[in-house]
């Protein structure tokens, strides 16, 4: 046990961890029954969170309230600071909602009373919490055991982001969790204490519906959604009481000036409304008649069945979707039990429910009136079904007696009985029981007498939240912001009758399409303009809706007013996702707000068709979205061929060219998700020139590291002709091999000129190439790659082994840049420098993928093996390494995009000529850009759970910058090289010094602070001096 003042804790009793601390469950050393929560903050992190810690301690000491977590003690040890706080044994509201799904209005009122009481004292002291969310609202049971709602005490916790805000002042710091942030906070505008009211509104909405009102894939998407939509209207269920609906609409106002103030919140009628006191259900005499073959235990243990687990629900859903219809639903069928056991059912746990007995034979069913619209499930989930043994009642021979105060409702039910007497019966012959919620307008109830266990046919289909029978709105996950509400035809159906049918028939039978009037389908959903990336996802969701329903097939009118997407698992993950030739996919490519670095491969589209958007602002939005070219074709074709099908200018001629090029070129599969049609070089040659990157050439399609590409033989050329290439000079070094030898071999000629289109990138030194290529075209050998095996270099002046066949004399020619203007050469030099810099940055990402030593040090620190703490720290280390990788990849992508935009602007202005060197460097920049985007997407997918669970890391992540990482890596590289030099290990010292100098030089070009630039420049100069000293010593030796 670890001792902290008068308290102690065990490191195995981990409660949770946040951005700056780990929380353990502890106890008082003398009063062992006094449980506390001990927050341990490592002093290594204290420098970053010291201000937050001081504010939290000060605020907690000042706030003494039963609905605010109490602070008992603060202890400072050599390595840590401990806060001893009140322990809440009920977990947090997020766990409670995870277990319950949704809450009833009465339960919400009980919780909201306590939240308002805590907010009243915060408001009186001028404190804003700034991070109100279900995870920071704790639950405490008074008697240490789970009881009903009245025994739950709400506690507001985690005041790390809280601050004092005096009257008539505004704050502008980004704090909190994005889904619960007020729009003015997430948009980095000035805000006041009303930001907490928005957070309370989102929490209430989640308690009522099961999800926050406005969601998105990322904080950036949510911010864009708030910026686009000036007025927000949350989708409030129709069965919500007017007071609660008014409260939600008042709290969830986008403009803080229109938002409800604290005084109106504290005195709102919903909080002041006195809930109707619930009495025990009155037994209703029923029709007599035996139920054959019924048997059920009467033990109380089987009366209330617990909700099925997730695997069970998945199995149930599969059975329900594949099972045939079981006939028309039997609504509110009453069992043939007696009323003698009514006292057993009047438990306090049934506060929010009306238990309906099996009193009516299976051939009777009726609809509930609209006045008795059922409401959401609350405390417990009760299900009873099957066949129960009837008990003789003394009133069994009499007609049903109306329940007191419900004569009119009972008369209407009796009329419905008569009108629906001819409806079909249950094929299984067993009456069904159901659990129906009371509504505000009609607290009518029937007594469910006896008990029975659920049968498979009676199991309610759920998906993510609990569905009590009678819930007027099925669960479906919240749509992504910006998506288009679809109209369902198989999941929803509307009834024009005045009554709302409540079916809990778990059959998956489809509903005829004509049963869904469009006027009801649009309902009160929030409709917003779709983002371009969501169009493709919605197309996939529309394909799956008819075969993947998420709600019972016989839905009432309450189901049809709020169409929503299906379940989260189907958002954008349809196996049918492919790159097709539909106009919608093409529109996605040509209308995407992301920077289209390279234009269309055809000359009909103007090159450099790049939207004028800032690349840095789109990077995070890009990596969190899925492009339609995500999956590659299964037949092994390169995505670049498929991408041509997406082009608007696609034609049969284009397809035939693709087939020919596919047969000639051995093309590699692109790792990027951007279409190669967008990535083809737009820096085309001069108008009328055939030497353009818009044409298929070996330089454009050869993968890095691959051997040269051989062109097909033209008709009439002998395949066995020997080709000889004469150039002047010495053979090039392997490190400076030509990047292109796209040369058309000619027959024997004495011409000294060059007709090569690739000569500009060849080495200035001449050489003689002798070989027997399969055709008259020589392929290209990229840097570092070996040439074709049939070629060999012969020094100038020596006789070639054979002069038979074709001979070409290739004179050395000057690079194109020699004759260019200085602006051209400076821009090209800058592009090459940024290319080398980003390649060094990409090399750094390989070593940032997680620190395995951290886990080992944690084991030695805690002296325990395989503990929860070590596992969590190890996983946290891996995720943090991925965060650093993501930051570096995003920075590299930003720099590459900026370089490509610079090249585009310079070409348009005529300062940069589209020479071969320019085209090659642009091609390399674009390939690296695609690679960075692909890696960003993969890392974002891996970190989705990390970001969602660690919302408190958002400020810490903002402090992780690529510039700091690059600088630290350069310093470590120089230090390790100097250490190796001291120990005479000089294999790659010069290489590491050069790489560090290159990183610092690139860093000096992107830093903004002049002081930082000056320091980096001094460090780089010292590295260069050391390099010159090494060169001098090497020359001397």
From Swiss-Prot:
InterPro entries the record matches: Atg1-like, ATG1-like_MIT2, Atg1-like_tMIT, Kinase-like_dom_sf, Prot_kinase_dom, Protein_kinase_ATP_BS, Ser/Thr_kin_STPK_Ulk-1/2, Ser/Thr_kinase_AS
Biased composition (Basic and acidic residues): 632-643
Tissue and organ expression note: Widely expressed.
UniProt PTM: Autophosphorylated. In response to nutrient limitation, probably phosphorylated and activated by AMPK, leading to activate autophagy.
Polar residues bias locations: 506-515, 571-585, 658-678
Uppermost EC category: transferase
Pfam families per UniProt: ATG1-like_MIT1 (PF12063), ATG1-like_MIT2 (PF21127), Pkinase (PF00069)
Name of the protein in question: Serine/threonine-protein kinase ULK2
Native source organism of the sequence: Mus musculus (Mouse)
Organism classification: Eukaryota, Metazoa, Chordata, Craniata, Vertebrata
Gene: Ulk2
């Amino acid at each position: 046990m670890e001792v902290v003042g008068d308290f102690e804790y065990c490191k195995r009793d981990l409660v949770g961890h946040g951005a700056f601390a780990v929380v353990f469950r502890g106890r008082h050393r003398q009063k062992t029954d006094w449980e506390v929560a001990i927050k341990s903050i490592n002093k290594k992190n204290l420098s970053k969170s010291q201000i937050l810690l001081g504010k939290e301690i000060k605020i907690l000491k000042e706030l003494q309230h039963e609905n605010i977590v109490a602070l008992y003690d603060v202890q400072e040890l050599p390595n840590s600071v401990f806060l001893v706080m009140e322990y809440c044994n009920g977990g947090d509201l997020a766990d409670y909602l995870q277990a319950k799904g949704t809450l009833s209005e009465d339960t919400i009122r009980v919780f909201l009373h306590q939240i308002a009481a805590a907010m009243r004292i915060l408001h009186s002291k001028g404190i804003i919490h700034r991070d109100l969310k279900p995870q920071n609202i704790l639950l405490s049971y008074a008697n240490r055991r789970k009881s009903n709602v009245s025994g739950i005490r709400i506690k507001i916790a985690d005041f790390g982001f809280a601050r004092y805000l005096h009257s008539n002042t505004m704050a502008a710091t980004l704090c909190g969790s994005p889904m619960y942030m007020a729009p003015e906070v997430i948009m980095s505008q000035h805000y006041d204490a009303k930001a907490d009211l928005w957070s309370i509104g989102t929490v209430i909405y989640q308690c009522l519906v099961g999800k926050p009102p406005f969601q998105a894939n990322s904080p950036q998407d949510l911010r864009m959604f708030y910026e686009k939509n000036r007025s927000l209207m949350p989708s409030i269920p129709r069965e919500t009481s007017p007071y609660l609906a008014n409260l939600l609409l008042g709290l969830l106002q986008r403009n803080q000036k229109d938002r409800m103030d604290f005084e109106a919140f504290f005195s709102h009628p919903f909080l002041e409304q006195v809930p109707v006191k619930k009495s025990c259900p009155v037994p209703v005499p029923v029709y007599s008649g035996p139920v054959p073959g019924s048997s059920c235990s009467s033990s109380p243990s089987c009366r209330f069945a617990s909700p099925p687990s997730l695997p069970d629900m998945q199995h149930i859903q599969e059975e329900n979707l594949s099972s045939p219809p079981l006939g028309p639903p039997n609504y509110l069928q009453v069992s043939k039990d007696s009323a003698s056991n009514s006292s057993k059912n009047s438990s306090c746990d049934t506060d929010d429910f009306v238990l309906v007995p099996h009193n009516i034979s299976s051939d009777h069913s009726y609809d509930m009136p609209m006045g008795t619209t059922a409401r959401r499930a609350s405390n417990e989930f009760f299900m009873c079904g099957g066949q129960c043994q009837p008990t003789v009642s003394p009133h069994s021979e009499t007609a049903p007696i109306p329940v007191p105060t419900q004569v009119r409702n009972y008369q209407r039910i009796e009329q419905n009985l008569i009108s629906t007497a001819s409806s079909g019966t249950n094929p299984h012959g067993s009456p069904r029981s159901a659990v129906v919620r009371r509504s505000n307008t009609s607290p009518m109830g029937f007594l469910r007498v006896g008990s029975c266990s659920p049968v498979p046919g009676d199991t309610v289909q759920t998906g993510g939240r609990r569905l009590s029978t009678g819930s007027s709105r099925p669960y479906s996950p919240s749509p992504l912001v910006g998506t288009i509400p679809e109209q369902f035809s198989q999941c929803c159906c509307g009834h024009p009758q005045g009554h709302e049918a409540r079916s809990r028939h778990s059959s998956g039978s489809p509903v005829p399409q004509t049963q869904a009037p469009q006027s009801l389908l649009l309902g009160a959903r929030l409709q917003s303009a779709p983002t371009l990336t969501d169009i493709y996802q919605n197309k996939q969701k529309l394909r799956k809706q008819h075969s993947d329903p998420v709600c019972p097939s016989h839905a009432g009118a309450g189901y049809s007013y709020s169409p929503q997407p299906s379940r989260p698992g189907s958002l954008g993950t349809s196996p049918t996702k492919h790159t097709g030739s539909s106009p919608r996919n093409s529109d996605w490519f040509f209308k995407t707000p992301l920077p289209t670095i390279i234009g269309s491969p055809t000359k009909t589209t103007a090159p450099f068709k790049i939207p004028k958007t800032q690349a840095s602002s789109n990077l995070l939005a890009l990596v969190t979205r899925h492009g339609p070219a995500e999956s590659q074709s299964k037949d092994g074709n390169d995505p670049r061929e498929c991408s041509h099908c997406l082009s608007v200018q696609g034609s049969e001629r284009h397809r035939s060219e693709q087939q020919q090029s596919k047969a000639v070129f051995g093309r590699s599969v692109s790792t990027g998700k951007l279409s190669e049609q967008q990535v083809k070089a737009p820096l085309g040659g001069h108008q009328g020139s055939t030497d353009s990157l818009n044409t298929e050439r070996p330089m454009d399609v050869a993968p890095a590291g691959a051997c040269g590409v051989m062109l097909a033989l033209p008709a009439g050329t002998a395949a066995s002709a020997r080709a000889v290439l004469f150039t002047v000079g010495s053979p090039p070094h392997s490190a400076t091999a030509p990047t292109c030898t796209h040369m058309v071999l000619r027959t024997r000629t004495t011409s000294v000129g060059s007709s090569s289109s690739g000569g500009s990138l060849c080495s200035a030194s001449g050489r003689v190439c002798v070989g027997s290529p399969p055709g008259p075209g020589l392929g290209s050998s990229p840097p570092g790659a070996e040439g074709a095996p049939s070629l060999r270099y012969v020094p100038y002046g020596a006789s070639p082994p054979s002069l038979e066949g074709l001979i070409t004399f290739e004179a050395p020619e000057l690079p194109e840049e020699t004759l260019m203007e200085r602006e051209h050469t400076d821009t090209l030099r800058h592009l090459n420098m940024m290319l080398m810099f980003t390649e060094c940055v990409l090399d750094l990402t390989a070593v940032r993928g997680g620190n395995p030593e951290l886990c080992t040090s944690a084991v030695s620190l805690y002296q325990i093996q395989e503990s929860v703490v070590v596992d969590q720290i190890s996983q946290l280390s891996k995720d943090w390494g991925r965060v650093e990788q993501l930051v570096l990849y995003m920075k590299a992508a930003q720099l590459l995009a900026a370089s490509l935009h610079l090249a585009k602007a310079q070409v348009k202005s005529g300062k940069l000529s589209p020479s071969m060197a320019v085209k090659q460097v642009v091609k390399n920049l674009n390939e690296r850009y695609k690679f960075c985007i692909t890696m960003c997407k993969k890392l974002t997918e891996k970190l989705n759970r990390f970001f969602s669970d660690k919302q408190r890391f958002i400020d810490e992540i903002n402090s992780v910058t690529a510039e700091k990482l690059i600088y630290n890596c350069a310093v470590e590289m120089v230090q390790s090289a100097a250490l190796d030099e001291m120990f005479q290990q000089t294999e790659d010292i010069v290489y590491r010094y050069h790489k560090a100098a290159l990183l610092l030089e690139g860093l000096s070009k992107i830093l903004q602070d002049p002081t930082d630039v000056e320091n980096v420049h001094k460090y780089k100069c010292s590295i260069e001096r050391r390099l010159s000293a090494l060169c001098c010593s090497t020359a001397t030796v």
